[in-house]
Amino acid sequence: MLSLNQLIGAPLTALGGILCLRWWIFWRRHYRGKLITYGPYSHVRHPLYASFLILVLGLALLITIPETLMLLLITLAVIPLHIRGEEEELLKRYGEAYRRYMKRVRWRLIPGIY
């Protein structure tokens, strides 16, 4: 019998992994040095980080050991810091185009939350 953690953690881990892979394929096909605002970037401004967070959350539920909980906590602490620095760089690089994008795609990581 599967535990509740396994029933939730396994699909989240798979979903996060699939989303990371889909992001990578999208990025390889579309990035040419210009700001991308379509595809997964039309939902959140940092789709790779969102995918990775889903993956790590799933792992923390699926493999209930202190190390995966620590990985989740570190991920939750580091991703927002990294996003902040990355967005400063994107504003410098793309200027007003990135500002318009930020207004249009309000959520950095999790729609409706952050």
Role assignments for model-derived ranges:
Residues 3-114:
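Cytosolic-biased juxtamembrane loops and peripheral soluble domains of multi-pass membrane proteins
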